[in-house]
C-alpha cells in the first residue's frame, strides 16, 4: 500500500489532504464526529470528484448529473469538504466550521433536505447502498422512456465495512446484480476496522466473492493509489454489470499514532496528534485554511462539469417541445391533470358495480384507472403480486434487458425494496409504489423512516392488515403495526373502508409530494359504504361523518378501514334500541390531527357515549377520541382461524360495540 510523506507530496496529495484537514479541523472544533473515514477515503473521493464524476456545483439539481451516495454517512465531513472545495456555493467555510451545530448546513450525518449536493440522507448503515440501487434503477427506467441523449448518468456509492455487514446490502446486491445495473459503482472503503476493533473479530466474509455471486463485477485496488483507483473506475464504467471496487485503505491515514486503529473512527484526533499529522503530510496551513493551489485545483475540477451540463442542455433543447415539457413535469414532481378525472371515474364504477370488495382489490381497480393517467408511476411487490394486487392491468414487468416496463419484481426483499423506492423518488422523474404484507412493514421500517425524514413521495401498499386475513395466524396478523407506523413523524397512514375511500386515499398519496404514504388494505371483502362519486375528496379531511344519527346523537362510533362497516352495523343495533347513533370514518389520523382544533371537535362531537373500534391495539387513539372513550380492538396477538371466527373470538363485533356504547350511556 502506498505511503506518502511530506517529502513526496503530489498535486493529487494536495487535493486529498485538503479534504483530510478540513475534516480533522471540523471534528476537532465540534469535539464530535468521525475523522477516520474522511482521512482514509480522501484519495478515493479526490479521484472520483476531480477525474470521473459528472456534476456542476452551479446547478446542483441538473437532471443528468451523476449521483454520489455516501452510504457511510458517519464520514459526512468527507462529503462536506468536497462540496466546499468543489464550489457548492452554500457550503461555505463558515458552514464547515459549524459542523454538527444546530441549524448548520453540515449536520452530523448528511441530510439531503438541508444541504445542496447531498443526494440522500444516510447514517443507518446499508441504507445508502440500497438507495443507490434505486437511483440506478431510476436512471435505466427514465432512459428507456426518454432516450440516452437525455438520461445517461452513473450512480456511485462509497460504502464502509459496516455497510456491507448489514443484511440490506445483500438484498440490494442481489437485486442490482439480477437487473444488471451496469451504471452502479460501489466503492468499498476496505479499512478492516470497526468500532469494536478489527473487522476480523466479527466476520470473515469474502465480500468480493459474495458480490460476484450476486452478478457483480469486482476489483481490488490500493485505496491510496490514485492511478489504480482511476483505472478501476474506468473499467467499472465499461462493465455490463454493477461493480464493487474494494479500495484497501488505512483509516485515519496520515495520523502517526492513530492511523489504522479504531481510535480514529469516531473521536477527534486531539491537538497534539493534529500537529503531528500536519507535519507527517506536509500540511502547513492553519486550521480551516485551504492553500490557494489546492483550492484552485478543486474549483477547476468543479467548474469542469459545466461543459457537460451545457452540452446536455443543448441536446435537451433540440427535443420536441411536448417531450421536453413532459420530462420537466415528471422531474418537477407535478401531477398530470388527468388524475382527477381518473379518480372520479373509478368512484363512479365502484358505485355502479356495488357489492363487497376487499380494499386490496379496490386498490387494484384504482391502479387500473390511474396508472395510464400518471405514467411516471412505477409499481412492484415483494413476491406478493397476486396478493397485494399492485400490478395494474396491462402493466409490463421490468427485466434485466428491458426497462420500458412499469412493474418491478423485487423478490422477498422488503427492506431492499423500500430503500430502492427511496432512491427512485430521490432521483426524481418517477413515483414509486410497492406492495407487501402489512406485518412485514417491520422489515421496511428503517427505509420508511428515512423516506419520512427526507419528505419523499414513496407509496407503500400494505395489505392483509389485521386478524381479518384469517388462517395464516398471528405471525402474519398485524396487531401493533398501525400504531407503529403512525408513530413515525411525517408518514401518512391511511386505512380506507371501501373502494371510494381507497380511490381517495390513492389521490391523497399521489398529491403528497413531501411525505411518504402507507395504504393499509384488507384481505377480506368489505361492503360499499360511500355512494357518492364526485370530485370532492372526503378522505382528505382525515375523519368525517359517514352515517348520521336519527336525531341528536347519544352515541358516536369511530372506526377505520374494515371496522367502519362493523360500526355501521352497531349503529343500526343502537338505533333499534332508541339510541340515535352516528358513525365517523377515520381514514387517517395524521390528516385529521392536522385540521384546526375547532374542526376536530365538531367531527368528534359531544355525544355522551363514544366508542372507537379498530382491529389493532388502542395506542394512538386517545389523541383522536380522548382517554374516556371506550375502545373495542386487540390486546394480544391473533390466532389461526377463519376471519369471522377470529372477530367473534376477540370480541370485535357490532354487538360488543353497541354494548360498550350502552355501558357508557348508563354511566353518563
Curated annotation (Swiss-Prot):
Record: residues binding substrate: 34, 265, 360, 387, 464, 472, 523
Annotated positions binding thiamine diphosphate: 74, 123-125, 162, 191, 265, 440
Cofactor(s) annotated in UniProt: Mg(2+); thiamine diphosphate
Calcium as UniProt keyword: yes
E.C. no: 2.2.1.1
Assigned protein family: Belongs to the transketolase family.
Descriptive protein name: Transketolase 1
Biological source species: Xanthobacter flavus
